[in-house]
Amino acid sequence: MTMHRFGQTRGARRCDHLLQTPDTFVRAPLPGMKGATAIVHAAPAIGAKFTQYTAEFEAGGTLGSTEAQRFVYVLEGQLEIDGDLLESGGYVWLPPAAPALIRAAIRSRAAVIEKPYVALAGIPCPTMFRGTETALTPTPLFSDPDVQVRSLIPSDPAFDLAVNTMTFQPGASLPMVEIHVMEHGLSMLQGNGIYRLGDHWYPVEAGDFIWMAPYLPQWFGALGKKPARYLIFKDWNRLP
């Protein structure tokens, strides 16, 4: 292992946000994992109402079961979900306690989000579904063609979460500082930029993770020569 340079890191922890950078990652298997390890990013221990981690699989590795709903997005490699193959950019949503087997066909990495499902009276819980990010038509954010959003979860009140990818052309930014009741888990997939979190401004790049608590002032602007892109979770469709 290479020794760290005098304890310096871009990573930071505040009461209402976390920037976790790859140099700070600690890997450990979670219960039920076989041939796989996890980098836990957000969890109830930090105050989050969901858990998000990166799962790193050897060929044949599997995830354990969970009583929560689960969203899996393939970052690299190939995952088999009950025999169906998901490649990079593919994803699956699983209802609570779903028995589906998630297995790596080759060495793979995936973003995993787990959250207790909050039901709505009279509306049944959705069934498992799969998708591919590139098959979705992007939508400009507030009519800005330089910021494109793909919604990976259907617009259906049965779902209590939203997961999107957002792509920013170099120099593009969010049009406002957002302050809202939803919390976020965000994985930087590509590029770099500046993220405002509260009264702190952080350089961020591909591989970073950000947790944002409710009502945290937040803003992002893309820098560099290529588009910046991230995967972002929020709680949705339920009373606070």
Mark where each language-model region is.
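Conserved short histidine dyad/triad with adjacent acidic residue
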Residues: 35-40, 49-67, 151-152, 164-180, ...
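Structural motif
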Residues: 78, 99, 109, 185, ...
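A short hydrophobic beta-strand segment most commonly corresponding to one strand
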Residues: 106-122, 160, 165, 211, ...
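Glycine- and acidic-residue-biased ligand/ion/polar-headgroup-sensing regions
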Residues: 67-82, 181-198
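Asparagine-centered strand-capping/turn motif at beta-strand->loop junctions
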Residues: 102-106, 220-223
